[in-house]
Amino acid sequence: MDVSLIEKRLLSHPGATKALHESWGWMVYWVGGKQFACEFIAAPDAKPPYAGRHLLSLKCDPDRIRELRAEFPDAVLPGYYSDGRTWISVDVDQAGMPGGPSEELALDLCDMSYRLVFSKLTKRMQREIAETS
């Protein structure tokens, strides 16, 4: 899947920003000071099944995580370096390919991640973001 499509979708949300986490080489996406996504290539020596994969980590509903893991066991993994109960890592190279999630689904998961994180911001922060967008 073309990463520019992912970036465009992630940054289309009100108040969304991105910043490179230089020491890790990860692109991290934020809203209201909270991370809602990150895109990166896992180190070649990372533990399996993450090693060397191009991943997109997203916040996700726990029930939806179980469904996605059952449907795409090799393409949707427990969140890398995050709580696997509430985060997933999608193999970007498998999105839109046979056996992997569709590009549309991957983009919908980006939207869900934003909504989940935005909903946990204070009401004041939500208003400020809405007013400046």
PLM region spans:
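Charge-dense, helix-prone N-terminal extensions
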Residues: 1-133
